[in-house]
């Protein structure tokens, strides 16, 4: 809730009226060569991923000798068009990869298109995901 407060410049009084509401959660176990296609979470405000066991995620060199990221979560930019103006080069990236780390929680807007890139490993990659909304106290 601290992020919500700071990003929106809400005062303590307003924040005291907000209550996070966990709508659903599930475990996702990714085996060797598993992945999760790009998707969004509908009818919710926030999505989250908690990395329980990242298995063998990280940088790997594939059989062709190419360095790639293994088992990352990819978040796609909601900005469809951008300018090449030097002050806005950060907008030119169409996706950001988050490299999983055990015990880390990632929270993101549910409308953000995201995926789990292919995972290659002998041990499973285990995450707990959830959807939530923010309600106002009654």
What are these regions (language model features)?
Residues 35, 111-115:
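Histidine-centered metal-chelating micro-motifs
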Residues 47-49, 122-138:
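A short hydrophobic beta-strand segment most commonly corresponding to one strand
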Residues 21-107, 124:
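Catalytic core of non-heme Fe(II) oxygenases with the double-stranded beta-helix
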Residues 1-15, 33-35:
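Non-heme Fe(II)/2-oxoglutarate
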Residues 76-78, 109-111, 131-133:
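Short, loop-centered acidic/histidine patches that primarily coordinate divalent metals
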Residues 1-6, 83, 91-94, 99-101, ...:
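Hydrophobic, well-ordered secondary-structure segments
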Residues 114, 119, 126:
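Extracellular and organelle-lumenal recognition/adhesion modules and their flexible linkers in secreted
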